[in-house]
Design a protein with these regions (language model features):
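Short loop/edge segments at beta-strand edges and connector loops
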Residues: 9, 235-237, 243
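A conserved FAD-binding loop/helix module that cradles the flavin
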Residues: 55, 441-463, 467
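Active-site/ligand-binding neighborhood in enzyme catalytic cores
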Residues: 131-229, 236, 407-420
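Hydrophobic anchor at the start of a short beta-strand
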Residues: 26-28, 259, 391
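N-terminal glycine-rich phosphate/pyrophosphate-binding loop and immediately adjacent elements
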Residues: 2-132
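C-terminal segments that line or cap access tunnels to active or ligand-binding sites in enzymes
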Residues: 302-402
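Mid-domain catalytic core of redox enzymes
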Residues: 240-341
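A glycine-rich dinucleotide-binding beta-alpha-beta segment and adjacent secondary-structure elements
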Residues: 177-190, 387-446
Length: 474
């Protein structure tokens, strides 16, 4: 008789663990709180406009990477969602000449240096660091070879230096404010500089594309792959407690030989078990975890913005919604069939530690009013920067950290962890003990989808080892 495995959460890590465990001979049930799979990697619709709430680029898009094999194994990438590699990657709209990051590193360096000759030396130094990461990739257990680590050695050797600097400090040597703003748009400046070099290198080396259909299409593909393998998913199901031998749902014990917790581990350690976990790693997580939070604004525009870049950096201050920013990034989905014919979906993220601000607004009754104020401020800026949108806004939607928390139970409404300078990641263990496992972004380094899928795969391997099953990846 097959061992029963219950997975708490149907996000990317939960789906991944479920697919591999089901293929490897377990009887797997995924319990998902929401009505759709994917967790924080999701899209949603308002009045015919689809808003991308998860993927903005996908590490593992490049077919030369081990991570790409994993995305294929779990069925995330199929014929129904081919990868699109936007080029330019980012364009700074500053009222003068547009400034761009292209997928060609030499072209980008040449244009930035021509725009700001006084920064030529600093730019060459930064781009040398970025070049060191051209062979760097997320290691995948059982796939990444010794030769791969040898090729990654140049990046590994400079990582300590970059890890000790924030992106903001690392880029402070750039004197021209436009060039500096464009580069800071790649990754939030509070993170360590290694994340900047790695991310920018991905754009320059044929990675970090966008899957057609976005987050939801990927998640639906994975859910279909899981069910096709024989697994079961129960949506709209909240797990109340994880106990020895199973989980409680609506007061009923669902028995299992093993439980894999893939919801936010920071939330789980305090709320999901009979008593809060007090292991050393759990105490460190409570003390040190730095969360990535954002305010999301999406609008539907009754205008075709196909002539505008896919990702635009607006060098315009935004001080509202608990954030104080000197610039922000706007995503243009005119070419992605995310809206009615002749119309366009436009979204923007406003990162910052705004959870407390929004929580206070909820408590004092001004939450909806402040969401509306954020929406109107964004619309005003959008109409100024892109005149075609003026008076053409058909729908607007705002998601705050409280929104993410309500739907996904993420700690402080965060969508991943920040990786700050001088700090190690505060990770939950993939294997807590035989029969109880963790997977998800809080079990690995920061970075969105890659640690989610890699940790789900690793946890399935550990499960197989404990129960003496052969790990099957196809």
């Amino acid at each position: 008789m097959k061992e029963k495995v219950i997975i708490v959460g149907g996000g990317i890590s939960g789906l991944t663990a479920g697919i591999y465990a089901q293929r490897s001979g377990f009887d797997v049930l995924i319990l998902e709180k929401c009505s759709t799979p994917g967790g924080v990697s999701t899209c949603w619709k308002r009045k015919g406009y689809m808003f991308e709430g998860g993927v903005h680029w996908l590490n593992g898009s490049g077919s030369h990477l081990d991570l790409h094999k994993v995305w294929l194994e779990v069925g995330a990438l199929q014929e129904n969602n081919p990868i699109y590699f936007k080029d330019p990657v980012y364009v700074l709209k500053n009222g003068k000449a547009d400034l761009a990051i292209w997928r060609d590193a030499e072209r980008t360096l040449k244009e930035l240096s021509a725009y700001s000759p006084r920064d030529r030396k600093a730019l060459r130094s930064i781009f040398r660091d970025v070049k060191m990461f051209r062979y760097f990739q997320s290691p995948v257990e059982g796939e990444t070879r010794i030769l791969d680590y040898v090729r990654m050695l140049p990046a590994i050797l400079i990582t300590p230096r970059l890890w000790m600097q924030s992106i903001g400090y690392y880029l402070s040597r750039i004197k021209d404010p436009d060039v500096r703003t464009l580069l800071e748009a790649v990754v939030a400046p509070v993170n360590n500089a290694m994340t900047f070099a790695y991310t920018l290198s991905g754009f320059f080396t044929g990675d970090s594309g966008y899957p057609s259909g976005g987050s939801l299409r990927m998640a639906l593909n994975m859910a279909h792959t899981f069910v096709k393998a024989g697994g079961q998913i129960r949506y709209n199901t909240t797990v109340e407690k994880v106990v020895d031998g199973g989980v409680f749902v609506e007061g009923e014990l669902l028995k299992a030989d093993a439980v894999i917790v893939t919801v936010d581990a920071r939330t789980a350690i305090d709320k999901l078990f009979e008593k809060p976990l007090q292991d050393g790693w759990a105490r460190r997580m409570r003390k040190l975890l730095a969360t990535s939070q954002t305010v999301f604004v999406g609008v539907g525009v009754e205008a075709d913005l196909n002539s505008y870049p896919k990702s635009m950096v607006f060098k315009v201050p935004f001080r509202d919604g608990g954030v104080d920013l000197s610039f922000f990034v706007v995503s243009n989905y005119a070419r992605d069939r995310y809206s009615p014919e002749g119309c366009t979906t436009v979204t923007a993220l406003f990162p910052g530690y705004s959870y407390g601000w929004w929580k206070a607004a909820k408590e004092d009754g001004t939450y909806e009013e402040k969401k509306q104020a954020v929406a109107q401020k964004f619309i005003g800026i959008l109409e100024e920067q892109i005149p075609e949108t003026r008076g053409r806004i058909a729908v607007v939607d705002v998601a705050t950290p409280l929104t993410y928390q309500r739907y996904c139970d993420t700690y402080e409404g965060s969508y991943m962890s920040d990786w700050m300078p001088f700090t190690l990641t505060t990770n939950a263990p993939n294997r807590y003990r035989k029969g109880l496992y963790f997977a998800g972004q809080r079990t690995a380094y920061s970075g969105g989808l890659p640690p989610a899928v890699i940790s789900g795969r690793l946890t399935a391997r550990l499960l197989c080892k404990d129960f003496k099953h052969k790990f099957t990846n196809k």
